[in-house]
UniProtKB/Swiss-Prot annotation:
Name of the protein: Flagellar protein FliT
InterPro entries per UniProt: FliT
Superkingdom in the source lineage: Bacteria
NCBIfam families associated with the record: PRK10548.1 (NF007836)
Gene: fliT
Region feature Required for homodimerization, mapped onto this chain: 1-50
Family: Belongs to the FliT family.
Length: 121
């Protein structure tokens, strides 16, 4: 059975999914990016299944190599963008924790509101 056309098509689909994920990450559409991840994983599994059945010829491997490089480049860029987002979220969580600690420590002062006042002298 010659699955070369099917394998090539599967790789093209993976490239499209990879480009979509990069676009979503670039546009900071994080929910959509996460939602698209399963389709990407399924496409990778489909390729793995196809290559288990029959190893691609040397010619086919040469044709697929540029696609693989593009996918790996896209994946690297997505990871960089995700790391930036994770750093932003960690900073926000840290700020929130500090704010919560301050409110917990100084928020309940026996019914008095602590606020700066003008000097009365």
């Amino acid at each position: 059975m010659n699955n070369a056309p099917h394998l090539y098509f599967a790789w093209q689909q993976l490239v499209e999914k990879s480009q979509l994920m990069l676009r979503l990450a670039t546009e900071e559409q994080w929910d959509e990016l996460i939602a698209s991840e399963m389709a990407y994983v399924n496409a990778v599994q489909e390729i793995a299944h196809l290559t288990e059945e029959v190893e691609p010829s040397t010619t086919m491997q040469e044709q697929l190599r540029p696609m693989l490089h593009l996918i790996l480049d896209n994946e690297s860029k997505v990871k960089q963008l995700l790391q930036i987002r994770m750093d932003e979220l960690a900073k926000l969580v840290g700020q929130s924790s500090v704010q919560k600690s301050v409110l917990s420590a100084y928020g309940d002062q026996g019914g008095f509101v602590l606020a700066p006042q003008d000097n009365l002298f």
